[in-house]
């Protein structure tokens, strides 16, 4: 892994299991944070580092499946690996349909869990990279002036500078100036690249996007 050390969160109400998992995770070069309940885990602020969650299904109060449902919307960058000593088919199906990365039944082989953790962390890193790219794109778009946004909106539909000028009531030379600044701010190397950016930002505004 490059950059930040991956964090593996563990939620299990069994003290011995938490201690064993913490040692195992640390032996793989990851940072481990353990919690005895879902409520303890939910009190922990979200991290912006590659991470995954090793989660016991049967927990007191808020169980593992309910926790999965609670964090599904705002922690898509944190894959979940379920572990349990007693699993039934409906439980496994529900967990996997909701996006679980893996479902392991205790006792499980340490290497199997470590492989699942590596895959989950890689997936988390990929999601975080995509989120960072999206934030960067939105920030670049936010830096545009109102006029530059108007020019961009028309350019990505295929209009020529002269047509853009006619619609906005400005000269073709002025359109070229705004277009040049807009392209630089958006870091777009070509019209096709700009169209792709617009499709990501506002899909409905780009024909056939």
Stretches found by the model and what they are:
Residues 88-90, 104, 108-117, 167:
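C-terminal output helix
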Residues 1-9, 15, 22, 37, ...:
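Non-catalytic signal-transmission and effector/linker regions of two-component phosphorelay proteins
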Residues 160-193:
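Recognition helix of helix-turn-helix DNA-binding domains
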Residues 183-209:
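Basic, Lys/Arg-enriched C-terminal extension of HTH/homeodomain DNA-binding domains
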Residues 34-52:
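Acidic, metal-coordinating helix/loop segments flanking the phosphotransfer/catalytic sites
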Residues 56, 84:
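Active-site residues of response regulator receiver
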Residues 36-37, 63-66:
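Acidic catalytic/metal-coordinating carboxylates
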């Amino acid at each position: 892994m490059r950059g930040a050390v991956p964090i593996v969160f563990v939620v299990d109400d069994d003290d011995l299991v938490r201690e064993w998992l913490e040692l195992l995770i640390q032996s793989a070069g990851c940072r481990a944070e353990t919690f005895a309940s879902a409520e303890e885990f939910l009190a922990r602020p979200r991290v912006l580092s590659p991470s995954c969650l090793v989660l016991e299904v049967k927990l007191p109060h808020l169980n593992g499946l309910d926790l999965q449902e609670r964090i599904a919307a705002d922690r898509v960058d944190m894959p979940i690996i379920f572990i349990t000593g007693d699993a039934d088919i409906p439980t496994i199906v529900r967990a996997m349909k909701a996006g679980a990365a893996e479902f392991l039944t205790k006792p499980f082989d340490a290497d199997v869990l470590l492989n699942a953790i590596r895959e989950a962390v890689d997936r988390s890193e990929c999601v975080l990279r995509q989120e960072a790219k999206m934030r960067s794109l939105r920030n670049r778009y936010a830096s545009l002036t109102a006029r530059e946004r108007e020019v961009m909106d028309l350019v990505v539909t295929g209009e020529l500078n002269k047509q853009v000028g006619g619609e906005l009531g400005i000269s073709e030379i002025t359109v070229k100036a705004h277009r040049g600044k807009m392209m630089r701010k958006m870091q777009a190397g070509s019209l096709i690249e700009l169209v792709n950016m617009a499709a990501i930002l506002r899909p409905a505004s780009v024909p056939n996007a």
